[in-house]
């Protein structure tokens, strides 16, 4: 449903933001 789609999108956004942050901190 719609809520599942929103949760999936939020999870993806959170994961990519976490990856970017990790790259800044550790230099990938």
UniProtKB/Swiss-Prot annotation:
Stretches assigned to coiled coil: none
Stated family: Belongs to the frog skin active peptide (FSAP) family. Ranatuerin subfamily.
Pfam families attached to this UniProt entry: Antimicrobial_2
Function noted in UniProt: Has antibacterial activity.
Biological process according to GO: defense response to bacterium
Protein's cellular compartments: Secreted
Stated name of the protein: Ranatuerin-2LTa
Tissue specificity comment: Expressed by the skin glands.
Entry's Gene Ontology cellular component terms: extracellular region
Organism: Rana latastei
Entries under InterPro entries matching the protein: Antimicrobial_frog_2 (IPR012521)
UniProt keyword list: Amphibian defense peptide, Antibiotic, Antimicrobial, Disulfide bond, Secreted
Cystine pairs: 23-28
